[in-house]
Amino acid sequence: MSDKTHSQADVAHKLWKAIEHHRTGMLGVSGDSHHFQPMTAFGEPETHRIWFFTSKDSDLAESAGGGAEAMFHFQSREVYACIDGRLSVDHDRARIDKYWNASVAAWYPGGKDDPNLTLLRLDSADAAVWLVDGGLVKYVLEVAKANASKTIPDVGERRDLNFQ
């Protein structure tokens, strides 16, 4: 990886901005027998929380129950991350109002008062983050250079974040 180093604050900023821009990742409960599921994320960098809309009878809502260790896997073109934390069911009406949009509404015919609607809240504890520098062109060039010189490609940086 790169010898460049980003500050912890810069890595966190890039992570939260990428989540805000791309939103979709895979959410799952650690140690649960269910597969991770694609979910739309609504991140709050100031509290290190990520909110997800789901049905109250979904595998995730049932597994989260009173709280469960969970992971959210996220990727964009420049940021890859695995965020670990505590997942719980939440019925925060202010968050429902704040994050409600046409895409969310499509899943809940009863609107914001749909009896199946609930929220999941991931209180992020830490994250492993990979920052990819230069995009696809740099990646292809670095792979070619590494194969020719028998070295490792320099495509970015891996960092750990602690949100506690």
Question: What annotation goes with each model-predicted range?
Answer:
Residues 14, 32-36, 62:
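Positively charged, polar, low-complexity stretches
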Residues 60-126:
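Short, structured beta-strand-loop surface elements
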Residues 53-55:
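Short His-Asn-centered micro-motif
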Residues 2-4, 113-164:
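C-terminal edge-of-domain segments
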Residues 46-51:
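Short active-site oxyanion
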Residues 1-24, 156, 160:
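N-terminal leader/targeting segments and the immediate start of mature chains
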Residues 16-31, 68-72:
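A short, Trp-centered hydrophobic/proline-enriched beta-strand micro-motif
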Residues 38-41:
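Conserved beta-strand in the GNAT
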